[in-house]
Amino acid sequence: MFDPFLDQLHADITARGGTPAEVPDGLAECHSAKGASVIRSWLWQVPGFRRWRVTRLDAGESLQVLNSVAYPDYGFDHPLMGVDLLWFGARQKLVAVLDFQPLVQNEAYFDRYFDGLKALNRQFPDLNGEETMRSFDPNQYFSSWLLFCRGGAEQAQTSLPPAFSAFLKAYWALHDAAKNNPATIAADEVKRLQENYDVYSAERDPAHGLFTSHFGKNWSDQFLHEFLFPASGQS
């Protein structure tokens, strides 16, 4: 279901000069005990970003997942990029979240960085559902203009592919524009806010339960704190 999206994301990263980085030991790939599920992850070094992670879970008709978060270098104060795509094949259910994840919540920051996402929100009405995400506070590390959908096969096949492509294009444009506009948040504060994002997300990550059900608690806890949100595991 999501392999074309994965290929497009990796092609974009590579075209931008991205090179593979080492995933923590034992976390690059894991198979479920029954062999029905496999999860693979990649870590990228990309110019302008201190960390870019990608994860793909394939559990056949039961579940398909694509997740990615891009952390800009501390010298940039623009939003993180967040992608969460889940497909439950047996139920023909799509959950999609595409967002520029803001470091702070204020109008000046939104005016500076969110014109592109606002335009996408208008362009793809199937993915601007007003239903609030249940596991997260939309007023912290999420924007009001995220592309969000709890839909079905129609959205997965018709709305999501062009929205995903446009979303990546808009985020690259955001990053390119930020190169020419000095950050208004100091680098040490950006570092603190990105670390807080990891802590906040690890406490609320709705995918952790899914990973645990497929790959066990011990591996999934390590994956959560060492790969997905590494700052959450620091004392």
Swiss-Prot record:
HAMAP family: PebA. The keyword Oxidoreductase applies. Its EC number is 1.3.7.2. Pfam families: Fe_bilin_red (PF05996). It is an enzyme of class 1 (oxidoreductase). The gene is pebA. GO terms for molecular function: 15,16-dihydrobiliverdin:ferredoxin oxidoreductase activity; cobalt ion binding. Catalyzes the two-electron reduction of biliverdin IX-alpha at the C15 methine bridge. It catalyses: 15,16-dihydrobiliverdin + oxidized 2[4Fe-4S]-[ferredoxin] = biliverdin IXalpha + reduced 2[4Fe-4S]-[ferredoxin] + 2 H(+). Keywords: Oxidoreductase. Belongs to the HY2 family. This is 15,16-dihydrobiliverdin:ferredoxin oxidoreductase.
